[in-house]
Design a protein with these regions (language model features):
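RNase H-like, Mg2+-dependent phosphodiesterase core
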Residues: 1-212
Length: 212
């Protein structure tokens, strides 16, 4: 057993606007008790304020790193790589930057063997992986908190430039309405994942009514 534990998770995978953020969290195993106290709830159930408060405490004993993949980068990469490959490469890059320790990853693939093959292709170090690992492993939940906070800050930055468009997720009525509006859609163009399946699905549902 190593003296260090580490976790990797992402935020923004299913979004149609804004970046995909992949984050790693790393700490000494002696801090597991504090880690469990701060990350006892699923990070998705925490309010933005609760995440900020938890993150401020986590930074006292955890190290965080992240990779931000912008919508423009995703649009550029998507013709040659699928989303799972893009995410796996970012995760492998973060894993290679860590000290040796027990690493758990919240894998995007449903099956571990598929994800492991992806990670090996990108030269990842030794790791374990589970689907929805952030719900079971506090160190992965810590990485999830960091990823969400980092992405939220970027979304707020975009919002300050173009106006309110909601969360950026296609399930959000504000986001769908923003994409319906010609003027707003033009402002959002640099931040929209044009090659995203979610955007194609919205188009198929006649999101852009009255347009060819």
């Amino acid at each position: 057993m190593f003296s260090y534990i580490a976790g990797i998770d992402e935020a923004g995978r299913g979004s149609v606007i804004g970046p995909l953020v992949v984050c790693s969290a790393f700490c000494d195993r002696n801090n597991e008790k504090a880690l469990k106290r701060l990350c006892s709830k699923d990070s998705k159930q925490l309010s933005a304020r609760q995440r900020e408060e938890a993150y401020a405490e986590l930074k006292k004993f955890c190290s965080f790193r992240w990779v931000e993949i912008s919508a423009a980068d995703l649009n550029r990469l998507m013709p040659d790589m699928n989303l799972n490959d893009i995410e796996a490469k970012a995760m492998a890059d973060l894993a290679k930057q860590m000290k040796e320790g027990d690493l758990m990853i919240d894998m995007p693939d449903r099956y571990a063997w598929t994800f492991r093959k992806r990670m090996e292709r990108f030269g990842a170090r030794r790791f374990e992986a589970e689907h929805k690992a952030d719900e079971t492993y506090p160190i992965v939940a810590a990485a999830s908190i960091c990823a969400k906070i980092t992405r939220d800050a970027k979304i707020e930055q975009i919002r300050s430039q173009v106006g309110d468009f909601g969360s950026g997720y296609p399930s959000d009525p504000k986001t769908r309405n923003a994409l319906k509006d010609r003027g707003m859609r033009e402002k959002l163009k640099p931040f929209v994942r044009e090659r995203w399946k979610t955007l194609e699905n919205l188009k198929q549902k006649k999101l852009f009514e009255g347009e060819e």
